Amino acid sequence: MKEVIDTVGRRKTSVARVFMTPGKGRVIINKLPAEEYFKDEVKCRVALRPLVLAEKTEDFDIKVNVHGGGISGQSGAVSLAIARALAETDDSVRAVFKPERLLTRDPRMVERKKFGRKKARKSFQFSKR
């Protein structure tokens, strides 16, 4: 096994780079503990879900650099990057992650605004007369 495993995860416009080393289970995101960085408990749980499902919360130290997008996109990007790193270390976790769709990049992006409209799909008010 390599000393440091680095992977990339993306979601919406967020990009997360994960550096995973054998350790005691510390997760540092942008130089802050994960619980401190994701103040919302749900977003923190989404980001660390692969570790819980693989039952490896105490086996690795994880350092994450994440930028772009908002908190929701960033937590999804971190989750994908951690899942990819764990899949690299142990092939048996792939079977656990596949049904949960943790190794799949979510393709949904914001739809662009069209000209002649208020938003992507919302039109200006229409008057017959």
UniProtKB/Swiss-Prot annotation:
InterPro entries in the record, alphabetically? Ribosomal_Su5_D2-typ_SF, Ribosomal_uS9, Ribosomal_uS9_bac/plastid, Ribosomal_uS9_CS, Ribsml_uS5_D2-typ_fold_subgr
Alphabetically list the UniProt keywords. Answer: Ribonucleoprotein, Ribosomal protein
Q: Name one GO biological process term.
A: translation
Listed Pfam families: Ribosomal_S9 (PF00380)
Q: Which GO terms describe its molecular function?
A: RNA binding; structural constituent of ribosome
What Gene3D superfamilies does this protein map onto? 3.30.230.10
Q: Which domain of life is it from?
A: Bacteria
A GO cellular component entry from the record = small ribosomal subunit
So what family is this one in? Belongs to the universal ribosomal protein uS9 family.
Annotated protein name in UniProt: Small ribosomal subunit protein uS9
Which species expresses this protein natively? Answer: Chlorobium phaeovibrioides (strain DSM 265 / 1930)
